[in-house]
From Swiss-Prot:
Its main location: nucleus. It comes from Oryza sativa subsp. japonica. Residues 56-76 form a coiled coil. Keywords: Coiled coil, DNA-binding, Nucleus, Transcription, Transcription regulation. It is found in: Nucleus. Residues 87-135 are annotated as: Disordered. This is WRKY transcription factor WRKY76. Residues 114-126 have a biased composition (Polar residues). Belongs to the WRKY group II-a family.
Amino acid sequence: MDAAWRGGVGCSPVCLDLCVGLSPVREPSAARHELLDRPAGCRGGGDSKSMTNDEAKIVEAKVTQMSEENRRLTEVIARLYGGQIPRLGLDGSASPPRPVSPLSGKKRSRESMETANSCDANSNRHQGGDADHAESFAADDGTCRRIKVSRVCRRIDPSDTSLVVKDGYQWRKYGQKVTRDNPSPRAYFRCAFAPSCPVKKKVQRSAEDSSLLVATYEGEHNHPHPSPRAGELPAAAGGAGGSLPCSISINSSGPTITLDLTKNGGAVQVVEAAHPPPPPDLKEVCREVASPEFRTALVEQMASALTSDPKFTGALAAAILQKLPEF
């Protein structure tokens, strides 16, 4: 304690009142009131021991009061904090925020700046090129409408793996792959006149019948059909009809000529009569082959050969199914 208090010299008391506005839990002792109500000159005249006891009681009362106030404040703060946790969506299981490295922060800022610049450039380009975009879209629409897709079925030997469909045009193979819905691979061809000719062809065996070869054509040729070389006219006709065997006889005032189309390779075999006539005129033969009568006879002969083929019905049904749209 202070020396002035020990010596009994009268002096002004030290005020230790730390009231913070909350009501005390209990009233201070009567000794404290009595000591505080005494005049300043009369406090130092008592016994030193009794004064020390009174001061100790006063300090104890103040400490008890402050402890109770602290306890009340702690309860109020805990109650307020507990009420704010549900509103802020915080809970004890939330993981602490991970530290962000400066490199990732720089990278994110750089990406955000690039995104902003690209958005500005796109907006300017969009404002300046609406007309061009509309024209190009219309042109693309027209191109899509002009694309023609057709399918052709050919019956082949199941052991043949060449995936070649002879249609009179020259093609260049540029790829082959296996599709998901068909175990047979699909071959991709371009017209030999590419890139000026945009026609493409896809050839693949039918998934239902391995003896059917399905060729899908995309686009139209912008060049005339290549003229067949000598001796390939019947081969082209046979390829258009599915390479079916047929024989045609032409009866005219001239010598009798038989065209045998049953030979493999499509070669024309001229069979002379029993009495060999004089050599025929080549121009006359070509004129007869190009005549409408020859074409009519060829069509009739091919039709009869198709109807007599037991597999023709199955091939025709498969071709019709290929043409029908998928529902």
